[in-house]
UniProtKB/Swiss-Prot annotation:
Mg(2+) 2 binds at D19, G44. Heterotrimer composed of an alpha, a beta and a gamma chain. This is Translation initiation factor 2 subunit gamma. Zn(2+) binds at C59, C62, C74, C77. Pfam families: eIF2_C, GTP_EFTU. It catalyses: GTP + H2O = GDP + phosphate + H(+). SUPFAM superfamilies: EF-Tu/eEF-1alpha/eIF2-gamma C-terminal domain (SSF50465), P-loop containing nucleoside triphosphate hydrolases (SSF52540), Translation proteins (SSF50447). Changing H97A: Reduces GTP hydrolysis 17.5-fold. Completely aboloshes GTPase activity. Mg(2+) 1 binds at T23, T46. GO terms for molecular function: GTP binding; GTPase activity; metal ion binding; translation elongation factor activity; translation initiation factor activity; tRNA binding. GTP binds at D19, H20, G21, K22, T23, T24, N149, K150, V151, D152, S184, A185, L186. The gene is eif2g. The lineage of its organism: Archaea, Thermoproteota, Thermoprotei, Sulfolobales, Sulfolobaceae. Residues 16-23 are annotated as: G1.
Length: 415
């Protein structure tokens, strides 16, 4: 009997400094190399959000952690009994390079839990290790596992010394008691212990499917090959993660903020209306989709609207749902004490009127000018509007420091 075909039910972010082995770790668990983009293969680093999913099961004849498997057979004991299916999970592989922080933040909005990857053969913490750690805390991703990777290239003493540094780093923070699991992703050593950790510490959250459905868009594309006959063209495809509610094939939907329209020098956005033609997770088609995993929604849209990630940062909801699209937003904010991500730990200066900030709201990243500053509240006029699907959505606030956008705080968007 084969395992059931189900959609993934939890999104796990894989974050950390560039070259610490995030993509190799995802491959060790799932068998999938997530860097598929030609530029990524050439440069050997993740640029877009990578993605992979896998099943998790448990062999009832084996002891844990060896009992955990990702396919319907057990290599540990060779038992004829099929391991019991537990759930399907998905991994979002975030880029670790500092210039791609906005991409990491758009991915963090989709994460139910995270794995912070630390290379055992480098000083700890590296700038983006610290930056990603702070970002997870800000966005509220509290189910964390720290993976000490590349333990095969250091001595036991060096690995233990770094383990103590990690414990010291998390002491007194929200992550004080998170598990630290040593692995070698390259040699697939201790991956079963990591899967056990995922089952224990990153549970599937409760999903209220009666809420109005909302999907955050992180990709959109044209699946037609050049030269396709007009009558064989397929509509645009939109990829992302559902954060609440349930979508079904044939539902009428809208994309917000929508299409940029310029009339007499004034820019506005108009919602894009369409219908769901198909729902896919990986290679499997489904009739409906709920939160968990990255979903590809097929539509009847002109593919020129969706090509080359054109709709990145949008949201999808039902055609008749009321969702405000705002050019001016009010944020109840908190500043960090120090700027994270830079080599030197600079003090965060107060926000000033008329300065330009970068705001990450859901999967959208937009720039805005501060129009008013009060004690714990700012008003910002945006260059590109954002769709705000509920009150108190978390936003990450970044400021340009020495030519790079750096996280300086977070806030709740009030509507």
């Amino acid at each position: 009997m084969a395992w059931p075909k189900v959609q993934p039910e939890v999104n796990i972010g894989v974050v950390g400094h560039v070259d610490h082995g995030k993509t190799t770790l995802v491959q060790a668990i799932t068998g999938i190399w997530t860097s598929k983009h030609s530029e990524e293969l050439k440069r050997g680093m993740t640029i877009k959000l990578g993605y992979a999913e896998t099943n998790i099961g448990v062999c009832e004849s084996c002891k844990k952690p060896e009992a955990y498997v990702t396919e319907p057979s057990c290599k540990s004991c060779g038992s004829d009994d099929e391991p019991k299916f537990l759930r399907r999970i998905s991994f979002i592989d975030a880029p670790g390079h500092e210039v791609l922080m906005a991409t990491m933040l758009s991915g963090a909005a989709l994460m139910d839990g995270a794995i912070l990857v630390v290379a055992a053969n480098e000083p700890f913490p590296q700038p983006q290790t610290r930056e990603h750690f702070v970002a997870l805390g800000i966005i509220g991703v509290k189910n964390l596992i720290i993976v000490q990777n590349k333990v095969d290239v250091v001595s036991k003493e060096e690995a233990l010394s770094q383990y103590r540094q990690i414990k010291q780093f998390t002491k007194g923070t929200w992550a004080e008691n998170v598990p630290i699991i040593p692995v070698s992703a390259l040699h697939k050593i201790n991956i079963d212990s990591l899967i056990e950790g995922i089952e224990e510490y990153i549970k599937t959250p409760y999903r209220d499917l009666s809420q109005k459905p909302v999907m955050l868009v992180i990709r959109s594309f044209d699946v037609n090959k050049p030269g396709t006959q007009f009558n064989e063209l397929k509509g645009g495809v939109i990829g992302g993660s559902i954060i609440q509610g349930l979508f079904k094939v044939d539902q009428e939907i809208k994309v917000l903020p929508g299409l940029r329209v310029e009339k007499q020098g004034k820019v506005s956005y108009e919602p894009i209306f369409t219908k769901i033609s198909s729902i896919r997770f990986g290679d499997e088609e489904f009739k409906e989709a709920k939160p968990g995993g990255l979903v590809a929604i097929g539509t009847y849209l002109d593919p020129s609207l969706t090509k080359a990630d054109n709709l990145l940062g949008s949201i999808i909801t039902l055609a008749d749902a009321e969702v405000p699209v705002l050019w001016n937003i009010r944020i109840k904010y908190n500043l960090l004490e120090r700027v994270v991500g830079a080599k030197e730990m600079l003090k965060v200066d107060p926000i000033r009127a008329k300065e330009t900030l970068m705001l990450s709201v859901g999967s959208s990243t937009t720039l805005g000018i501060v129009t008013s500053v009060k004690k714990d509240e700012i008003e910002v006029e945006l260059r590109r509007p954002v769709a705000v699907w509920s009150n108190n959505i978390r936003t990450v606030i970044s400021r340009q420091i020495a030519g790079r956008w750096r996280m300086i705080g977070w806030g709740l968007v009030e509507i």
